Amino acid sequence: MKSDIEIDHSIKALPITEIGKQIGLSDSQLIPYGHDKAKIDAYSIANMPRQGKLVLVTSINPTPAGEGKTTVTIGLVDAINRLGKSAIGALREPSMGPVFGLKGGATGGGYAQVIPMEDINLHFTGDIHAVSAAHNLLAAVIDNHLHQGNELKIDPENIYWRRVLDMNDRALRQITLGKGRVNGPERNSGFDITASSEIMAVLTLSKNLFDLKKRLSRIVVALDVQGKPVTVADLKVAGALTAILKDAINPNLVQSLEHSPFIIHGGPFANIAQGTNSVVATDAALKLADFAVTEAGFGSDLGGEKFMDVKVPVLGKEPDAVVIVATVKALKFHGGVALDHLSDKNVDAVRNGLDNLNRHLEAMTHYGKPVVVALNKFLDDDMEEIQLIKNFVEGEKKLQFEIVTSFVDGFEGSLDLAKKVIEATDNQRFFMPLYQADDSIENKIQTIVEKIYGGKDFELSDRAKKDLAEVKENGWGKLPVVIAKTPNSLTDDSKIHGAPTGFTIHIRRFIPKIGAGFIVAMAGKVLMMPGLGKNPAAEKIDVDENGKISGLS
């Protein structure tokens, strides 16, 4: 079979204006970035009514290679369109860090891809660069304020705002700023990856440009010497940050290999942020099609939970159905099989791994919406193992199950899934929030630990206790909680797989993200700046004399 990038190069994209016309957008409502991608003028569709149903795609805890959520999402959108309905995919923008690191690209795979995959995976329309620029302008303003006399009496030991870079670079996690007599006060700081920036979270949760500016204004960058918050509004740079982001607020329109419309916008990671695409993009998809199909990062314990508890209240629309993606390989992995033996037949390991799938099914059914299981089939999967999974889902759990082969078969590999998803969205059920908005932060964390992770309780480090006291003192104690933890486990220990019980989640810090509107609880050893592996994906990427890129996947 051809590589992803070879398949991409074999398909001629339609002019992006043609894709716009498919969903009722005139040329004047598009801001082209070349011939195959464009921004949608969000203001031009602001007053349109929503007409679509919302489908959320999430997964079980993934293997390091991922479960193929994006591939399944793309195949599902293509299939719904082939069935005579209109569907738009709403995806996150890939970060270049993982593209050059372990994961590779994030535009689907095989015959279920969005294009142009090189552009989307690399610079795209510049949104992530804009977030980096805005974030680092704010960092520069903070250090300049310290250098110019510190009128706001910022406590240098209580500055939350670090710098960001859209790259995996562990060497920048801890740095010293201001070395040298004329370079400002010396202090310890560091870099995080851009996807973890609060400005990325703000961009993805803002409803329009006015909301964006308002949220930017209330970002808390530090505490002063009396323990009071210092905000962007105090530093008088909300307007400057908004100016950098004024085009980035508009969502990006591209197409699949099958010429289905996709809106790709925003890219926060689900393990260190809320892990969803933008409210603006999802809202646009709901206005322009019968079905808006979106995904949330990593497993349902991370992106799925945060979509329901953080994004849904802002979007004002809950999913009409949830698709949980699983693979035979991941179930073997959670059943105790080593990574280099996942292709070996092992029915017992699959049976043991069903506990992990079951935990994710229980987590999503807490919200009351219909759940469909999509098994992303690999060529070497054994049918006995697949039948075991099917029997568990349909027999024991009484849920819909379908095999997906979009990677090899394109839209045809998702037609049966599409039929079941469409049927599921007709099954109207009340949405049940996991917790009440006015619950305490402690109660929210305990609820997530018990009902989503399947754990027993949580404990706070001394630093976390101090952080929580500051959060409550400043009146932020009722905000939603985003737990930052490993995606590889239901616990905060990446080495513990399957579906353990009786465990404790260890919260080491609380970080207020007041512009975004939530509090981040840092659990375990999760890092805000990833590192590269021994053999990063960057080693496989090349460009020929004609400018054609190879090695992206």
Swiss-Prot record:
Recorded superkingdom: Bacteria
UniProt-listed Gene3D superfamilies: Domain 2, N(10)-formyltetrahydrofolate synthetase (3.30.1510.10), Formyltetrahydrofolate synthetase, domain 3 (3.10.410.10), P-loop containing nucleotide triphosphate hydrolases (3.40.50.300)
Record's keyword terms, sorted: ATP-binding, Ligase, Nucleotide-binding, One-carbon metabolism
GO BP: tetrahydrofolate interconversion
Keyword Ribonucleoprotein listed: no
PROSITE patterns in UniProt: FTHFS_1
Pfam families, A to Z: FTHFS (PF01268)
Catalytic activity: (6S)-5,6,7,8-tetrahydrofolate + formate + ATP = (6R)-10-formyltetrahydrofolate + ADP + phosphate
Residues making up the signal peptide according to the UniProt record: none
Pathway assigned to this chain's UniProt record: One-carbon metabolism; tetrahydrofolate interconversion
Record-stated family: Belongs to the formate--tetrahydrofolate ligase family.
Protein name: Formate--tetrahydrofolate ligase
Species name: Oenococcus oeni (strain ATCC BAA-331 / PSU-1)
Record lineage: Bacteria, Bacillati, Bacillota, Bacilli, Lactobacillales
Chain's gene name: fhs
